[in-house]
Amino acid sequence: MSILADTEKKMAAALEFFTKEVRSFRTGKANPALVETVTVDVYGTTMRLSDLASISVADTRQLVISPYDANNVSAISKGIIAANLNLQPDVEGSIVRIKIPEPTAEYRNEVIKQLRRKSEEAKVAIRNIRRESNDKLKKDSDLTEDAVKGMEKKIQELTDKFCKQIDKMSKQKEVDLSSI
């Protein structure tokens, strides 16, 4: 695999990781990503909630979790409580309802700080990938100096592209958090 393709693949993976982290921030709107990764102890093992139930949005402030096996309702409820997400599950027969509370101004400010920190960490990861790729490029003696400069320029363009995507996602999430 070429250095450029490898660089783009690694940067895309870093962006995907950041995207998953951003989705997990609670904005006050119901979003299945809030609880998808919650772990639940069932069948003598630990499983992700998304593997045990369908998670749907009932309205802007409520999630409905429908377990594939109704016997897991109480375990799912316990798993959500244990995840410390400040969400209170309501068991109603064979489903679990979660009402998403209105976030306080203090909570929103804290989440925005976390978002900015995660955004910066993601951009640092992208820049580290750029540095590693440039180092590999310089060690590759097969390329001429002009070819190395051209590849470095392309790697920088990739870096800029991915950093802009991170900034765009971060700004959009800040708008979502601020407009609650």
Curated annotation (Swiss-Prot):
Domain of life: Bacteria
Keywords, alphabetical: Cytoplasm, Protein biosynthesis
Entry-linked PANTHER family: MITOCHONDRIAL RIBOSOME RECYCLING FACTOR PSEUDO 1 (PTHR20982:SF3), RIBOSOME RECYCLING FACTOR (PTHR20982)
Coiled-coil region: none
One Pfam match: RRF
Keyword Cytoplasm: yes
Function summary: Responsible for the release of ribosomes from messenger RNA at the termination of protein biosynthesis. May increase the efficiency of translation by recycling ribosomes from one round of translation to another.
Database matches in InterPro entries: Ribosome_recyc_fac, Ribosome_recyc_fac_dom, RRF_sf
NCBIfam families linked: frr
Places the protein is found: Cytoplasm
Lineage: Bacteria, Pseudomonadati, Chlamydiota, Chlamydiia, Chlamydiales
Family under the similarity heading: Belongs to the RRF family.
GO biological process: translational termination
GO cellular component: cytoplasm
Gene label: frr
Name this polypeptide is given: Ribosome-recycling factor
Organism expressing this protein natively: Chlamydia abortus (strain DSM 27085 / S26/3) (Chlamydophila abortus)
The keyword Cytoplasm is annotated on this UniProt entry: yes
Molecular function via GO: ribosomal large subunit binding
